[in-house]
């Protein structure tokens, strides 16, 4: 038995709203061990909704709808489902009373069109909404088919899912197995290069291993169906350790780890501090660091040295370095890193200088050329050269530069 998620709303098709409901429900279905192979997004059109139901009915036995439960004329989910299964609607008195009470709490009378939200197909059970006015339903229109409907508001949907739908599904025998996944995260290696290193793992059937690209990183998802999360972890653990050993320093964390959170944890463990000097990233590196709770333990501050005179006056970069090597150069990056480390009194200094575009590139230093300087606790400076090209644009170059700068520091911390 499989489930299919059907999200209703023209605003979703137009890209006006991020469809976070489908992501959440997919994760929840995996947690409950309910197979889920398809998702559908359909606009507020009765005939197209019916076609979506007909298609989903052929390949799933649990249909989960979100959206289209409001009081306006374009909220059509409930009546369209009822019409598809040729079932009349009936007004639920308890829903009317609940909606009236919620309006009374705000000092307003219930609008006439809200009565529409109390209509449910004959035989359907109420899926109560504790916070909003749009209830859902639990309905078996056919013996081998379960329909669950939820409002499109994510907070309401999640509360109804956890509070009502999950207990119901568990009472029907679901949730006895789980599909647990662990995501391994890698930095400084491309998806194809990583795939070559771990290709033998892709043929496994339990657990399964699959690569996918994240923003500025590569990820491997290891998934395992099992009777419990603890058992799934036991199965996954040795596979994950093998992959991490093969990847070496290209592996930086798992699941919710970010490159900034890992760097922060390493600095905190060592009792060390860092400061940053940024040119083309304009504060992006500092932002990644300060996104982490408690980052004041190890991050002392930074200088945005966009103008060359700021590099000279605030960071102490020798004017001759800029004149003869250029503002975008290994020498300037190293001098900036040393300067910010010395002036802020930290153990480490990181600096970024580069050409993010869309202008400023030359044949010698094209757009996407970025130098990262690193000053260590011994006062020694080093650098790496990043060459992104200009295909993905300015913001992508800036973001990747900040991530790669942190990764450069991570590798030094983990190897020293």
Swiss-Prot record:
Q: Which domain of life is it from?
A: Bacteria
CDD domains assigned = cinA
- SMART domains given in the database record: MoCF_biosynth (SM00852)
PANTHER family recorded for this chain? NICOTINAMIDE-NUCLEOTIDE AMIDOHYDROLASE PNCC (PTHR13939), NMN AMIDOHYDROLASE-LIKE PROTEIN YFAY (PTHR13939:SF0)
Q: Which family does it belong to?
A: Belongs to the CinA family.
Q: Which NCBIfam families match?
A: cinA_nterm, PncC_domain, PRK00549.1
| Name of the protein described by the UniProt record | CinA-like protein
Q: Name its species.
A: Synechocystis sp. (strain ATCC 27184 / PCC 6803 / Kazusa)
